[in-house]
């Protein structure tokens, strides 16, 4: 140590800089450890993008008036997409319009180029209103499992009066319900208790899944979303394949990937509100003959579907943390994510020097 006294000013400065660099590297390493990567997975329309929007509302800056205005044309486009889907299904399902005038109204809506829509004309609004009130369209809506229709169709169409007003600015709920298929990878980082949660949302449609592999490094937790209401629906990409069977097979593939051996798995059984509605008229046993519970029983249906997914786990040592959710309900997601955050931190105590 005596030699230190003989160091030149230049050497002392060099040592100081080296020590500072060492300290910074240690800090950087610690900071890197204080980031959690949560990968949102699930088939198309399971609610992943809605969940990301909720994180922005609950843990981020939310949606300002200006942000919400930016969703206006998407709301309009969602309305036309839904009405056009029902008009096409009227032909396919051979349902008659009760009101003769609605054949003309259907033609008005049919001619709209959805991706070019930026406003609603008076004629279009009148046509949409009359069509939605037609008993034929209502029958077509009730048979929506036989074709592809967005979950938000009824929400927007029953509120067309408000949406058609010139002063219309989408509400937070309107924003949550906008359907835009995710293509590519969306990352949303937010800070919670000095830890960065980096949430990664990838497209759920089959064509998007090949991109997932780029996200598989250093994943702390998988959050896999299941749409409970899809037990009686077919895939958009393949109309003779049950959506829940596809989701179940995907879940099994994901949890057995070698990349995720050390990642915790959290299962969100989403759209519980839609299941409660649907189970009253669409019986689970018609699609899953192994179901032995009573008809029109929400709890029995939920428990059966949860077990379907739990049974995909071949590693009985690995715990699957499950929650029933409604991604469009901010309070429900606030409550559920608080529990998820605690679970994730609990599982990563040592890494974050919390013990």
Curated annotation (Swiss-Prot):
Domain G-alpha: 34-355
Listed Gene3D superfamilies: GI Alpha 1, domain 2-like, P-loop containing nucleotide triphosphate hydrolases
Pfam families for this protein: G-alpha
Classification of source organism: Eukaryota, Metazoa, Chordata, Craniata, Vertebrata
GO BP of this protein: G protein-coupled receptor signaling pathway
Entry-linked InterPro entries: Gprotein_alpha_Q, Gprotein_alpha_su, GproteinA_insert, P-loop_NTPase
Family stated for the protein in its record: Belongs to the G-alpha family. G(q) subfamily.
Molecular function GO terms recorded: G protein-coupled receptor binding; G-protein beta/gamma-subunit complex binding; GTP binding; GTPase activity; metal ion binding
Segments of this protein annotated with the region G1 motif: 37-50
Binding site for GTP: 42-49, 176-182, 201-205, 270-273, 327
UniProt protein name: Guanine nucleotide-binding protein subunit alpha-14
Organism: Mus musculus (Mouse)
Complexes and interactors: G proteins are composed of 3 units; alpha, beta and gamma. The alpha chain contains the guanine nucleotide binding site.
């Amino acid at each position: 140590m005596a030699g230190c006294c003989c160091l030149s000013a230049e050497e002392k400065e060099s040592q100081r800089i080296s020590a500072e660099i060492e300290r910074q590297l240690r800090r950087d390493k610690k900071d890197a450890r204080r980031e959690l990567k949560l990968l949102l997975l699930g088939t198309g329309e399971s609610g992943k993008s809605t969940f990301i929007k909720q994180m922005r509302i609950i843990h981020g800056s939310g949606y300002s008036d200006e942000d919400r205005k930016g969703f206006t044309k998407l709301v309009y486009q969602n309305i036309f997409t839904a009405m056009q889907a029902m008009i096409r299904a009227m032909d396919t399902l051979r349902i008659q319009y009760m009101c003769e005038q609605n054949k003309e109204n259907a033609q008005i809506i049919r001619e709209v180029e959805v991706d070019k829509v930026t406003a609603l004309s008076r004629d279009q609004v009148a046509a949409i209103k009359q069509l939605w009130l037609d008993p034929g369209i209502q029958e077509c809506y009730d048979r929506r499992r036989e074709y592809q229709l967005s979950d938000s169709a009824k929400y927007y169409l029953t509120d067309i009066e408000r949406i058609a007003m010139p002063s219309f600015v989408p509400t937070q709920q309107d924003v949550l319900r906008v359907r835009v298929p995710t293509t590519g990878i969306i990352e949303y980082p937010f800070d919670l208790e000095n830890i960065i949660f980096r949430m990664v949302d990838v497209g759920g449609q089959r064509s998007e899944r090949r991109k997932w592999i780029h996200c598989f490094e250093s994943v702390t937790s998988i959050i896999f979303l299941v749409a409970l209401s899809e037990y009686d629906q077919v895939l958009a990409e393949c109309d003779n394949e049950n959506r829940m069977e596809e989701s179940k097979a995907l879940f099994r593939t994901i949890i057995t990937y070698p990349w995720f051996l050390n990642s915790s798995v959290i299962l969100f059984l989403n759209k519980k509100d839609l299941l409660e509605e649907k189970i009253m008229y669409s019986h689970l046993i018609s699609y899953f003959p192994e179901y032995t519970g009573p008809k029109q029983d929400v709890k029995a249906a939920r428990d059966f579907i949860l077990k379907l997914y739990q049974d995909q786990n071949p590693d009985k040592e690995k715990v699957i943390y499950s929650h029933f959710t409604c991604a469009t309900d901010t309070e429900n997601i606030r409550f559920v994510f608080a529990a998820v955050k605690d679970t994730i931190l609990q599982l990563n105590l040592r890494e974050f020097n919390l013990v």
